[in-house]
Swiss-Prot record:
InterPro entries: Cyt_b/b6_C, Cyt_b/b6_C_sf, Cyt_b/b6_N, Cytb/b6-like_sf, Cytochrome_b, Cytochrome_b_C_euk/bac, Cytochrome_b_N_euk/bac, Di-haem_cyt_TM. GO terms for molecular function: metal ion binding; ubiquinol-cytochrome-c reductase activity. Heme 1 (or BL or b562) is low-potential and absorbs at about 562 nm, and heme 2 (or BH or b566) is high-potential and absorbs at about 566 nm. Belongs to the cytochrome b family. The gene is MT-CYB. Its cofactor is heme b. PANTHER family: CYTOCHROME B (PTHR19271:SF16). This is Cytochrome b. Binds 2 heme b groups non-covalently. PROSITE patterns: CYTB_CTER, CYTB_NTER. Component of the ubiquinol-cytochrome c reductase complex (complex III or cytochrome b-c1 complex) that is part of the mitochondrial respiratory chain. The b-c1 complex mediates electron transfer from ubiquinol to cytochrome c. Contributes to the generation of a proton gradient across the mitochondrial membrane that is then used for ATP synthesis. Keywords: Electron transport, Heme, Iron, Membrane, Metal-binding, Mitochondrion, Mitochondrion inner membrane, Respiratory chain, Transmembrane, Transmembrane helix, Transport, Ubiquinone. It is found in: Mitochondrion inner membrane. The lineage of its organism: Eukaryota, Metazoa, Chordata, Craniata, Vertebrata. It comes from the Eukaryota.
Amino acid sequence: MAPNIRKSHPLLKMINNSLIDLPTPPNISAWWNFGSLLGICLMTQIITGLLLAAHYTADSTLAFTSVSHTCRNVQYGWLLRNLHANGASLFFICIYLHIGRGLYYGSYLYKETWNTGVILLLTLMATAFVGYVLPWGQMSFWGATVITNLFSAVPYIGQALVEWAWGGFSVDNPTLTRFFALHFLLPFLIASLTLVHLTFLHESGSNNPLGIPSDCDKIPFHPYFSIKDILGLALMLFPLMTLALFMPNLLGDPENFTPANPLVTPPHIKPEWYFLFAYAILRSIPNKLGGVLALAASVLILFLTPLLHKSKQRTMTFRPLSQLIFWILVANLLILTWVGSQPVEHPFIIIGQLASFTYFTTILILFPMISTLENKLLNY
């Protein structure tokens, strides 16, 4: 019998082992769909971004006009822009759900896969931040000014670091051109890191909702999960197209329809919705360096989760107390997101401080404590 080219060809063999004959646990739920959705998001963003870059001018005097020109005069330019801007929002929705799944089902115990995933998240956040600056509207300009200024909190080298990042003494043309270069480059770094992420994942195989080994009972990825992923894609495309076609500016900031003006500060500078939780943590600490450290810790804390796992069970499926704490953490993040969008005044300041404190307490103290308690209750 002739060898199957799918299994013998050096390149096709890799695709086959990743997408066709990949042994997969039979009981993984829809929460396992988000990995493939993130891959599709990345491809969509790269394609729409490439087409937008063909019409964009990375110059502080022309950037705003070139984006306007793309929307008005380029065939389907408005659609490209709306898909790219709202695709970023969907990308973050998917990655947050993907991370939530990982926390709930103990996927972080695959340490290499988890750590590369956190690095992917950090790269994605950097990409989204530099991308938000490119339209050169008011919020783009002032967002860039505020966030890059945080580097000045680094002792001794802070000021030099900021001026080096800016390419001058303020956010100006050199800043815009280098941000465009970075925004073009980073998605390809994300794509290569994704391959590393998948390499580590396929080394161990997927986790499953029960958190038990499933080697004795696996099924091929295709057709079972390829069909399931296509359904997930259809369900994801629906909100994306609804958003891009009917409410394209729902998640944007009205300030960004005004060209950047260094002489006029917007009344309330805030990032896109997907960074608001971290922004709220940054603002809740009245000290600049402390705020920057808390901001970094809010995401870097994910690296610690494998070390904080004290339960004898992998997933939270049969741990109701841990489930309660998990959903409290989710609610807490939603509160932080809401507070981050509000002005810095009385009720919001204290709510933000309490929510920030609760965020770190939940992850660092409550999860390990509750897990240990559950072990005792279950006589482990």
